[in-house]
Amino acid sequence: IFTKKKSRLITTDPCFPMYKVYSEINQNKLIFIKYNKNFTLDLKDFYKKINNKIDAIIIANPNSPVGDLIQEKDLIKIIKKSNKYGIPFFIDQAYFEFSKTDMIQLVKKFDNVIISRTFSKGMGAAGIRLAYIIANYKIIKLFENVRPLYEINQIAVRYGLFLIKNYSLAKNYCVKTIISRDKLCKIFEKNKIIVINSKTNSI
């Protein structure tokens, strides 16, 4: 929808591996934002790399496999600059249930923000391959124009509806995971083992 052959995309390194795969398939050029030695994203470099030659930006927030989370105030600065150039800004929130953050308000503030979420992580339903996007009306219409004829099977629909109606089951699972994750991080720190305070379901 937003890219073509030789389009330039910004993402982080490391990132979700499929970003690279799909970029290669579409013959796009990926521009990577690296992490510093203390495992924090170089936000100054991120801001600097945004210009009128960039066609799209995609980040995972929280990011797996690193586990870090870009704070909303820092994210807004980057989004504002990308919006100035009309650059679509994708936020992959596959792990948002484990971060206690919600970026939906950014869709209301900026018309270039697209949020994707999945039932695979916090919902524990990777096998049904069910996900969704949150964006403004104009962007949703663009996605509707390229929807495949057979996109979601009936098993995925039924199980997805079950999980929505019984969201407390998934929420309890996420809470237990967060408690265990944070407890393990403290044990590592106590034993002087360097660890990133992850905001995903892993360390």
Residues covered by each model-derived region:
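Active-site phosphate-binding strand-loop segment of PLP-dependent enzymes
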Residues: K37-E97
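Helix C-cap/helix->beta junction micro-motif
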Residues: N26, K84-Y85, F110, N191
